[in-house]
């Protein structure tokens, strides 16, 4: 890790600690420091959404900020944990948005969601259904919560295997193995759900 990256990690950790201790300005400083990275995560998640989605990456980051305001009392450890939680919150925002749209339509047919079984990242089709993925992840959580965390960190937050291993306190080898199993399980679930 370069000195600049290390310094930024230290800055992020310090801001997270200040924020959790009640410093209201720390969240603003944190978002200023991490806005571009949060927006990149949001853009990655929005690429998986249907064309014409009413949210855009900027709106998603702004919604994230509003939800983070309520998370001040969480125990924040480091930059990687922050991005894991931010990615999970963005996913929840998209799920809530999709559910609200579906309720407004009074129904709607689910869309086929495909995951690239051979790819490193289980990329939901750009026209994928965030609700189908969320439902599948909830079923997986009942079986193996660790695999859900790995999917959240790798797929939604875009963390590397090494970063994911660090956040979870596991070896990269274990994370790779669990990542493969989780992708295969999710792929199978989404295939069954679409048939």
Question: What kind of feature is each model-predicted range?
Answer:
Residues 1-195:
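Intrinsic, short, N-terminal disordered tails of RNA polymerase sigma-factor systems
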